[in-house]
Structures are given as C-alpha cells and as structure tokens.
C-alpha cells in the first residue's frame, strides 16, 4: 500500500486552493526553493498518519491554519490522502469502485471552534470512504507504519542505549518469539553470574547492602543486587549501543606478529585489503571474513587490534546519518502481520554527505525498495545530485507564482 495522491488546503503556506502532489511506489522526491513548503508537506503527511491519539508525534495547532497576505487566518484546513494497493480488509478506507478496485482514501479536516469557556480550539474530523464524520478506527492506522527522519536529526542520540532507541526497536522486530528471547536472557544471566563471582563485585554489593541496612534498620529490610543489566529481554534491547570499528588496522614493524604479517602480505601481494609502508602492514578489517590460510597467531593479533573502536560522537555526522538510516530501514523491511504500508519520510538525506556518498544513498534507498516493494520513500532535497537520480515521474516541484503556491508533478 502506498500514497498515490495528496491534497493540502489552508495549511501554513498553502491557501484554500491548495496543492496536489502525485506519488508513486518506490523513491519520490519533493524539490523547491527555500520556504517553498516542502517541510509543510512532510508535516501534513505526518499529521495525517498520526490521527489516532496514541500514535501522535506531531500536532495540528492554531498556528498551522493558513494566513493570507491580508492577515486573515483560515477557518479550516483539509488533508485528502489517496492510496493504492489497499487491502480489502481495511474497509474504512478501501474504495471498491476505484480504478482497478485497489484504491482507497481518507480525509482529515481541522476547524476552529470556540469552547464553552470562550477559548478557541482546533477540532479534527477524520473519515474514510463515505460520509464526512464517520471516524476512522485505530485498527486502520495500525496497518500503516510511518517513520520520519527530520533535517536536524540527531543520529548520535537516536542510537544511544534507551528503551525506544532505533537499535532496541530493530532487535524487538528481529526477535519476536519468546523462545529466542529467553535464550538471550539466559546468556545474560550466565554473564551476570560470572561477573558477580569476582571478589571486587562481591565487595561492591556487600558495601551497598551493609550501608542500606544501617539506614533502613528494621523498617524496610531491602536487599540490592548488582550486575550488568536486569536479566530481561527489554533490558537487553534497551542497553544496545553502536560504535564504529576501524576500517584499517596496522601491524607495526615493532609488533611481535610483524614477520608473519609480512609473510602473509608477500603471499597475497594482489590483495587490495593489504597495504604496506614504512610504518608496517595495514589490513582492512573485513579481511577477517576469510582467513583460512592465515596463521592463527596473526588472526588473533589482528582481532586484538581491530577490537579497538570509537564512539559515535567521534565519528563524522554524515556517516552517523548513514548508520541511522540503515537501522531505520532495517526495521521497516521486517515483515509484520497486519502492516500493509511502510512509509519513510526523510528531510534532506544529503545532510553532511559528499556528492559521491549522496549517490550511494540513493542507490541504497532504491535497492531497499526493490527488496521490499512495500516501502515507499518520500524525501525533500536541495541536492542536484540526489534529484537527478530520481525517476522524473517521481519528482514533485513546489514553486510560487503570482503570490500562490503550485506543485508540478513531472
């Protein structure tokens, strides 16, 4: 299921005539000059798909009503979303009379209302096929998975250990069955047990509990245990963190394994994953994926050196953005029962990326969609490199003429 058409009226920069954008399956781009309304389109989609309360991460406010050039604010705003390849089970939005019988639609109207206490508020009315006012249920929106990556995304913080981090979400999606989750908890229990056998840990636990007993006396009599993390699957997911492995490692001329490294380099002089200079011999860490003919001592040494890493904050912003996008797309590509639409919204995916990497990003996004045709990607961009890679029929140009906003689908 994917968005085929979107109409926006009286929302921010868009007046009562509004604009209409056309989308296709796969990768779509929205382009236009600064302040043309690209971000407003993305926010309109986010608001539309977070209609049910528990899915809201963005809200429509009174400031979102369009204000005309004469200073008058609109009394209503309207979003019309038209979909294709809608399953028949989504009866609230499926339109059996559409071309091909697979179309669907839903609508959200926002109105200014005066509450009984005289305060102006915003009322939202949403409906699917049929009469305005027939509300949509949460079941319909549960079938739609929408993810947004903003232009000012903080990839470093998003990847930090937390209950709702992207890494935690990915692990929960990859390990849905309780048997495997229990196996992971058993491994953690074993690690905790081994750790607590160390005398230093025993002393730490005893010190805490002795002091606690002195404070509590006979009132609470609580006892504290310590370990790596609480032995529960959610704790494992919440504690996951990402760090960056070095691409190249150096076995220096003063290293005890230098002679073996030198011999291996001579035997594999055509291997581009091995380089040599006056400092020693460099190995690309990916060489460890196939080292059947490498001396075990050298393998061990390369692994020791490669075990060094650095935190994400020490990494470049561009590469952190790539890591973040990879994690999000990995989670979205996992098949889930009852989910028929995966929509990824990205503002300026070119942020902090060299043009060559921008090309790789587009290739990655396109390949991801081909692997799972159920993922639709819509991004905004100022990058000629990215825009030139998108099919001409998948580009929407937003522009202004004679004080009005227009959208030109190519």
Show the residue positions of the predicted features.
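Switch/communication elements of ASCE P-loop NTPase nucleotide-binding domains
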Residues: 1-50, 243, 249-410
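Conserved P-loop NTP-binding catalytic core
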Residues: 42-102
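Electropositive, glycine-dotted interaction segments
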Residues: 78-80, 86-193, 202-203
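Amphipathic alpha-helical domain-onset/packing element
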Residues: 196-237, 261-286
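Glycine-rich phosphate-binding loops of nucleotide-dependent enzymes
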Residues: 175-185, 192, 209-213, 225-233, ...
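Flexible glycine-/small-residue-rich
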Residues: 81-85, 150-153, 228-230, 244-246, ...
């Amino acid at each position: 299921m994917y968005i085929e058409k979107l109409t926006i009226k009286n929302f921010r920069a868009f007046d009562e005539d509004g604009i209409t954008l056309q989308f296709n399956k796969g990768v779509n781009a929205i382009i236009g000059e600064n302040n043309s309304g690209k971000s407003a389109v993305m926010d309109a989609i986010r608001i539309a798909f977070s209609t049910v309360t528990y899915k809201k991460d963005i809200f429509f406010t009174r400031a979102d009503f369009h204000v005309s050039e004469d200073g008058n604010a609109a009394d209503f705003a309207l979003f019309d979303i038209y979909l294709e390849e809608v399953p028949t089970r989504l009866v609230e939005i499926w339109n059996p009379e559409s071309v091909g019988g697979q179309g669907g639609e839903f609508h959200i109207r926002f109105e200014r209302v005066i509450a009984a206490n005289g305060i102006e508020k915003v009322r939202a009315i949403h409906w699917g096929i049929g009469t305005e006012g027939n509300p949509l249920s949460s079941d319909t929106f549960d079938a739609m998975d929408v993810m947004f990556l903003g232009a000012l995304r903080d990839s470093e913080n998003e990847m930090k250990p937390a209950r709702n981090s992207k890494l935690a979400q990915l692990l929960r999606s990859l390990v849905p069955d309780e048997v495997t989750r229990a196996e992971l908890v058993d491994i953690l229990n074993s690690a905790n047990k081994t750790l607590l056998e160390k005398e230093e840990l025993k002393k730490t636990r005893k010190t805490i509990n002795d002091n606690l007993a002195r404070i509590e006396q006979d009132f609470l009599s609580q006892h504290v245990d310590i370990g790596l993390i609480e032995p529960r699957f959610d704790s494992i997911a919440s504690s996951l963190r990402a760090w960056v492995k070095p691409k190249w490692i150096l076995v220096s001329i003063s290293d005890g394994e230098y002679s073996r490294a030198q011999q291996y380099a001579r035997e594999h002089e055509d291997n581009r994953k091995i380089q040599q200079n006056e400092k020693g011999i460099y190995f690309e860490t990916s060489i460890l994926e196939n080292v059947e003919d490498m001396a075990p001592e050298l393998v061990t040494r390369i692994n020791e050196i490669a075990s060094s890493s650095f935190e994400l904050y020490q990494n470049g912003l561009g590469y952190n953005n790539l890591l973040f996008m990879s994690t999000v797309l990995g989670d979205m590509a996992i098949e889930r029962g009852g989910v028929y639409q995966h929509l990824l919204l990205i503002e300026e995916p070119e942020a902090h990326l060299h043009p060559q990497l921008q090309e790789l990003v587009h290739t990655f996004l396109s390949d991801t969609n081909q692997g799972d045709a159920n993922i639709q990607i819509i991004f905004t961009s100022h990058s000629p490199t990215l825009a030139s890679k998108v099919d001409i029929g998948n580009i929407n140009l937003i522009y202004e003429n004679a004080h009005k906003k227009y959208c030109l689908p190519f």
